[in-house]
């Protein structure tokens, strides 16, 4: 099993396998999730002081704040999947 990594801005990288959701930070429930994570010590601020544009929720209940748009993070995740799928297809062709 290969490890897939996603750049979430400013040189910060997370494991795609641990990702549960990428959401916008504007809604009240997400703001509540951020505050609860901060109180539990499970908040990771990767914004470098910039405005939070994406909130990333992981399977370990960590909440990661990013200054990159959610759509951008999702596109990076999808491009990683396409690269992996192309690699798998090439490996299958070589085996034949």
Swiss-Prot record:
InterPro entries xrefs: RemA-like
Domain of life from the UniProt record: Bacteria
Transmembrane segments: none
Family: Belongs to the RemA family.
PANTHER family tied to this protein: REGULATORY PROTEIN SSL2874-RELATED (PTHR38449:SF1), REGULATORY PROTEIN TM_1690-RELATED (PTHR38449)
Name recorded for this polypeptide: Putative regulatory protein Teth514_1762
Species this chain originates from: Thermoanaerobacter sp. (strain X514)
């Amino acid at each position: 099993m290969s490890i897939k990594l996603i750049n979430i801005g400013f040189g910060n990288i997370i494991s795609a396998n641990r990702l549960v959701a990428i959401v916008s930070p504007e809604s009240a429930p997400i703001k509540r999730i951020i505050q609860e994570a901060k109180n539990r010590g499970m908040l990771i601020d990767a914004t470098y002081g910039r405005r939070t544009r994406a909130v990333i929720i992981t399977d370990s209940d960590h909440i990661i704040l990013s200054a990159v748009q959610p759509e951008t993070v999702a596109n990076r995740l999808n491009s990683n999947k396409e690269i992996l799928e192309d690699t798998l297809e090439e490996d299958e062709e070589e085996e034949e």
